[in-house]
Every structure is written in structure tokens, then in C-alpha cells.
């Protein structure tokens, strides 16, 4: 009796290899999407922090620039508690009063040099986020803050 050889003997383990390749691609793509989502969340949080600091500077014109920086980083003028974002410090925050005390004065709060750190270093370990600046018009009724 003549026995016909099938190709199945030559394909042993191919399913396992295909599964390993597919899982590797899927897991890598999944972590890339998670990291991209975290980067977008940090982008939004930094933008909101700059807005929050500018709003505080306009509404509390008797406050110092350090209080504004604390509001940006900690969400509290006293600077107590944990920073709202990892790696964000008051050194990353700049507060500029332009013609403050006049009717057309402005307050600018900017966050610069923030390093976004990846949880899983697919691309690299850190990237520098762009600067976030918020400028609001202020009327201080003649009061000029101490740290101008």
C-alpha cells in the first residue's frame, strides 16, 4: 500500500510561531496607544494648569508669583500636597506681569521644559513637552504685586 505524505508534518509549530508574532505586534501596539493616551492627558493637564495659574493671578492680584506657581504645580497657593503631575515643579513655571496696575495690563503664566516620562520606553525614556502659555487681561485697581 502506498502511503501519501501530507504537508502537515512539515508545518508543525507554525501556529505557535504565528501566534507569538501576532501577540508581539498586538501588545506593542496596545502599549503604544496607552502611552500616546497618557501623553495627551498630560498635554491637557499642563494646559489646564497654566490656565488655572493665570486665573488665580488675575483674581488674587495681592498674591505673589510664588503663590501662582504653587497653584499651577500643587493646585493650592500654600504649595502643600503632591504635585498634580509627576516631574512638574515650580522651576518649570514662569509668571510675567505686563503693565499690571494699568487698565490694559496682562498676566502671563507659562510652563516650559516639562519632561514627559514614558512608563514603557518604546520610543525613548523622556520627551520634552512644548511650552504652555496662558495670558489673561487683568485690572488691579492700581495695585502692583510685590514680585513684579
For each predicted feature, which ranges?
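Short, conserved structural patches
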Residues: 2-3, 51-148
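Alpha-helical assembly-interface signal, strongest on the long, hydrophobic N-terminal helix that forms
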Residues: 1-73
